[in-house]
Amino acid sequence: MDASTKVKKGAGGRKGGGPRKKAVTRSVRAGLQFPVGRIGRFLKKGRYAQRVGTGAPVYLAAVLEYLAAEVLELAGNAARDNKKNRISPRHLLLAVRNDVELGKLLAGVTIAYGGVLPNINPVLLPKRTESAASAPKSPSKAKKTPKKA
């Protein structure tokens, strides 16, 4: 063999020995944050079917990402309503149970340290009388007199 004709190593069977391109993950291609490759691996490893199509993990990752974003947005709103900066399991429970569709989807799910929804049966509430209903709830501001020092 001639010294001028060297065999390039590291091409890995690819044509051309130029600089290697940066790998682009399937999550980036699909514009997702959830890991498409890992979900595909779990689908194959779990033996849910003999074969798994190439689009199945992408679709499943998109669905899971949407559900996570929906729950987190509602839980963030619940945390803000309670004047908190951190989402707690209580906020997750309030978010899920106050949303009709998520409540139906997660009907049999128990959230640890979530508590229960605040609910008082109307029968247990004190009855309103007619005189209390007609009277104003708070005195008007015109009747108040300023305090004298």
Curated annotation (Swiss-Prot):
A motif (SPKK motif) lies at residues 138-141. It comes from the Eukaryota. InterPro entries: Histone-fold (IPR009072), Histone_H2A (IPR002119), Histone_H2A/H2B/H3 (IPR007125), Histone_H2A_C (IPR032454), Histone_H2A_CS (IPR032458). It is found in: Nucleus; Chromosome. Its main location: nucleus. Keywords: Acetylation, Chromosome, DNA-binding, Nucleosome core, Nucleus. Residues 1-24, 128-149 are annotated as: Disordered. The modification N-acetylmethionine is found at M1. Residues 140-149 have a biased composition (Basic residues). GO terms for cellular component: nucleosome; nucleus. GO terms for molecular function: DNA binding; protein heterodimerization activity; structural constituent of chromatin. Contains one SPKK motif which may interact with the minor groove of A/T-rich DNA sites. Phosphorylation of this motif may regulate DNA binding. This motif is reiterated in both termini of histone H1 and in the N-terminus of sea urchin histones H2B, but its presence in the C-terminus seems to be unique to plant H2A. Core component of nucleosome. Nucleosomes wrap and compact DNA into chromatin, limiting DNA accessibility to the cellular machineries which require DNA as a template. Histones thereby play a central role in transcription regulation, DNA repair, DNA replication and chromosomal stability. DNA accessibility is regulated via a complex set of post-translational modifications of histones, also called histone code, and nucleosome remodeling. The nucleosome is a histone octamer containing two molecules each of H2A, H2B, H3 and H4 assembled in one H3-H4 heterotetramer and two H2A-H2B heterodimers. The octamer wraps approximately 147 bp of DNA. Belongs to the histone H2A family. This is Histone H2A.2. It comes from Pisum sativum (Garden pea). The lineage of its organism: Eukaryota, Viridiplantae, Streptophyta, Embryophyta, Tracheophyta.
